[in-house]
Amino acid sequence: MNQTTYNIIIATDSFKGSMTSYEAGDAIATAIKEQTPSRVTVYPVADGGEGTTEALSFGRAAVLPQCITVTGPLGEKVQAKYTIFGTGEEKTAILEMAQAAGLTLVPVSQRNPLKTTTYGVGEMILDAVRKGCKKLIVGIGGSATNDVGIGMLQALGASFTDINDQEVSDGAEGIENIAAMDTTGILKKLKDVDIKVICDVNNPLVGDEGCSTVFAPQKGADLQMVQRMEQAITRFADLFAKEYDRWLAGAGAAGGLGYAFAYFLHAELVHGIDLVLQEIHLEEAVRTADLVITGEGRMDAQTLMGKTPAGVARLAKKYAVPVIAYAGCFGDGIEQCTESGLFDRVYAVTEQEGAFDPQMAVRDLGQKVRETMSEWIHMIDTKKGANE
């Protein structure tokens, strides 16, 4: 056993289908502690997708899971879960819009973004605010909608009426008929509430890269529907939000929900990994580390595009701390990771793509750590020697 004590920070994403972020980190930590008396700290992390709630609520006081009945994407009632933690001014709710308006809630045969609504998302927000939350963190991935958040805003108290002074219908088709709007009641309800929206796409509201053109076909729209929604949303922006930037990066996320959050609710659109790292105060720990270990189930070219390992590695490199990554497997473009300069070493547990057997995942990851540990310990010692 190596008797040198190292300060090691472990911050891996989940290995999807096999291990949560904490389980993966704990498997690595256990293997390390068998070989060296190092100080090893595990931080669950995520990039806005699976495991984000776990990462943000880990180690927090008064974590309270919530389950409420809200309006689903087709107007039906669905059960939506979210989490509250903290107290007082720090009382925070973590919500995922997909719980109320996610694509998985809509049968394939009924997917039609002209009809689907974000009304339930607004109901979730109201519930959290009524329970005293002063901070909201909202993930907006996996939506079934393209209504520019009109449904959410209606649930929060806004009114969107047609030429007959009647409330418009649900979904993107309702946008076509909006003649007037009144949003005065919304900000009163959300007074002193800070909202951060996890948004990991940079698409604008309209245009060739906008929400209708790029994402609506994935939600059941045909070409005619796409053109119809693009025209309606452009008209809406012209009439009611002309001074606001429809080209804002992220405005087109979740069928324009990013636009509604930014413009009407004054929310901040943030990248998932950046928010998580900030909220868990990882930078403070990384500053004095001898080594940072990160990873995810599959590392490939997409890893560098806002994924957890890249975010963690960039933070470590800010303080010239060595970084190694363990992946369940490698995918196309892994050489972009190895040549990026972010990672000092990258290891794959298996050459086979796809999820591990969950029962074998912890064992196999731990074994890979044991097999490679001498290599990266030598790297740390060499770096320390060079700095002395």
Model regions and ranges:
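N-terminal loops that bind phosphate or other acidic moieties
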Residues: 2-140, 144-388
